[in-house]
Amino acid sequence: MAQLEEVSIDQYKHLVSERALTGETMLLNMGPQHPSTHGVLRLLLELDGEIVVNCIPDIGYLHTGIEKNMEAKTYQKAEVMTDRLDYMNTMGNNLSYVKKKEKLIDLDVPARAQALRVILVELQRIASHLVLIGTWGLDLAAMSMFLYCFREREQILDIFELVSGQRMMTTYIRPGGVWRDVPVEFEKAVRDFLKIFPKRID
């Protein structure tokens, strides 16, 4: 097993100001365990008293070697791993992956499947943004905002469950189309969501 190397200021000298190197300002690590970063990044902050004068982001904490692991998988098994790249955007990750496969073999996708993909990826984007906004509110102690956002997100996850059998990690979008056609209740479920969501935003 590889040993972890000690991180020294020498690795960051070229990124921070002279004031930080002389001790006039303070360098502070925020994350990757800080409650407001949700474990996916580290921020090296340069502080002058209580004022942040510089911020160096380190976003490498989300990388889990998935790309390397996918090299040893069949294309069907590899797609399941795209759900885990960003669990808030599984449909978008599936789509990005299968679009490359389709381009590689010059595969045409039926118009209905293309439309379903767009609808589901856009719903996924809304659900992802609701988590973002809700957790921002939670970080500011706005519990109600968090609960409102998650209430709307639940309705979207219900639609995903209706379509794919899963609320998250759906692996629904497949090369050449989608896993299966949507059930008859799909249109009503989406229309019901679209009817209430604009009012709830206001």
Task: Label each region the model flagged.
Residues 1-42, 46-202:
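Active-site bordering "gate/hinge" segments
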